[in-house]
């Protein structure tokens, strides 16, 4: 399993994925990325229509448009947005790591000096 998959699974389990997704959507809207991608899609559709690639017999499918737009759209994401998201994910993972360590330490506190549990 890749680190990306592990992080994805963790954020889904903790409910943080929706927070991260909302943050990403907000930042992409604020920086104008969504408008740029919308314009990119329009331009591609216009180019295909002018070139005769899109006719009444042969339509560009959504999948084809997504395949063409995705690499370009990813390069348009500002570095500041990428860094902010990465920092947010690291914070979430660090908090989880700290909580896991704190819970483990609490278990050890239940034992007295002789190694027997206090009840």
UniProtKB/Swiss-Prot annotation:
Q: Which GO terms describe its molecular function?
A: C2H2 zinc finger domain binding; chromatin insulator sequence binding; TFIID-class transcription factor complex binding; transcription coactivator activity
Localization, UniProt:
Nucleus, Nucleoplasm; Cytoplasm
Q: Does the keyword Transcription apply?
A: yes
User: Which Gene Ontology BP terms does the record give?
Assistant: heterochromatin boundary formation; mRNA export from nucleus; poly(A)+ mRNA export from nucleus; positive regulation of transcription by RNA polymerase II; protein transport; transcription elongation by RNA polymerase II
Q: Which domain of life is it from?
A: Eukaryota
User: What are the boundaries of the region Disordered?
Assistant: 93-119
- A Pfam short name: EnY2
Among InterPro entries, the record links this protein to: TF_ENY2, TF_EnY2_sf
What keywords appear on the UniProt entry? Activator, Chromatin regulator, Cytoplasm, mRNA transport, Nucleus, Protein transport, Transcription, Transcription regulation, Translocation, Transport
Keyword DNA damage among UniProt keywords: no
Q: Which Gene3D superfamilies match?
A: 1.10.246.140
This entry carries the following GO cellular component terms, namely: cytoplasm; DUBm complex; nuclear periphery; nuclear pore; nucleoplasm; SAGA complex; transcription export complex 2
Where are stretches of biased composition, namely Acidic residues? 96-119
Record family assignment: Belongs to the ENY2 family.
Q: Which HAMAP family match?
A: ENY2_Sus1
- Record's function text: Involved in mRNA export coupled transcription activation by association with both the AMEX and the SAGA complexes. The SAGA complex is a multiprotein complex that activates transcription by remodeling chromatin and mediating histone acetylation and deubiquitination. Within the SAGA complex, participates in a subcomplex that specifically deubiquitinates histone H2B. The SAGA complex is recruited to specific gene promoters by activators, where it is required for transcription. Required for nuclear receptor-mediated transactivation.
The record describes its quaternary structure and partners as: Component of the nuclear pore complex (NPC)-associated AMEX complex (anchoring and mRNA export complex), composed of at least e(y)2 and xmas-2. Component of the SAGA transcription coactivator-HAT complexes, at least composed of Ada2b, e(y)2, Pcaf/Gcn5, Taf10 and Nipped-A/Trrap. Within the SAGA complex, e(y)2, Sgf11, and not/nonstop form an additional subcomplex of SAGA called the DUB module (deubiquitination module). Component of the THO complex, composed of at least e(y)2, HPR1, THO2, THOC5, THOC6 and THOC7. Interacts with e(y)1. Interacts with su(Hw) (via zinc fingers).
What is this protein's name? Enhancer of yellow 2 transcription factor
Organism per entry: Drosophila willistoni (Fruit fly)
The protein's gene is named: e(y)2
